[in-house]
Amino acid sequence: MAVNLFKRLNRRHPDDLLYEDLCRDVGSDRVSRDGASQLLYSRDGSTFPGGIPGVVCSPETTEQVISCVKAANIHNRSFVPRGAGTGLAGGAVPCYDPKVISSTKMNSILEINLEKQFAWVQPGVVNLDLTKALKGSGFH
């Protein structure tokens, strides 16, 4: 509704410039603001009521995450970091029209060191995938 109002007044919505900068910096295939994406990223696994994100960005590298955060700061916009959205504490629920930075495409297990008992994973790795990678090791 706000976007339509801005268009009727022949003005740009504040998210337009942010959206353009993100498309330029991380690629238009990694940035969305359509209704389906907004609905998908409006909730996590908690019972908290959802919020509607302004722009959804799905970076694939650390450098792209940095670009997303810088763009949010330049445009004075808040952002919500989001993994797979399975959290039960409401940490990925967007409030007050923020930008969502989704790490679901950053889902690599970088290193598993059984001797030192650690795993180095990207933020989009879900617990089930790590459990599968550890199968038979005595860890889960």
Predicted segments, located by residue:
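Noncatalytic alpha-helical scaffold of FAD-dependent oxidoreductases
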Residues: 1-140
